[in-house]
Amino acid sequence: MIDYRLEAPPILRDFLVYHETIQGHSRRTVDEYFLDLRNFFRFLKLDKGRVARNTPLGQISIDDVDLDLVGSVTLSDVYAYMNYLSRDRVVHPNSPDARNGLSAPARARKVAAIRSFYKYLTNKAKLISENPMQDLDSPHLKKSLPRYLDLEESVSLLEHVDGANQARDYCILTLFLNCGLRISELVGLNVTDVR
């Protein structure tokens, strides 16, 4: 398990601590921000010639990332990074069906992390005077409606509930089907919430 408090350079660690303690983001969200920004800074160091051109991205340290590097980033740098993500980044490198290019939603999440980092540096930490990511657009995402079960599919699903926790599982599925709950909402549900 990663611990950004030990691995992140100070400028990045301060941002991540802010998100976890002040913004109240979950540890998992903050860890994902760290991974996204670590990869971005690795790419920047490679792209700006701060490491040898043939250095594998995963072997580039970000310990020396500081305000000079962060402050030199332009929209063009981020567009180059997005191009790398969409064409060259290996998806699931240890998988037998590894392919190149991240999906638009995956790239959009990375854009959100970069945008949030620069917003923090500008508005909260006041380390840079102008936010270079203010005009950064997210990749276009196709809007799709959720797929719903029809009545017969819902009945069939409920009829196939069995096992040691049949009553509990039936109740959970009934809540999902009738209330449209998300998994996080269901997990956070307490007996006292039900009237």
Sequence positions of predicted segments:
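Conserved catalytic core of the tyrosine transesterase superfamily
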Residues: M1-R195
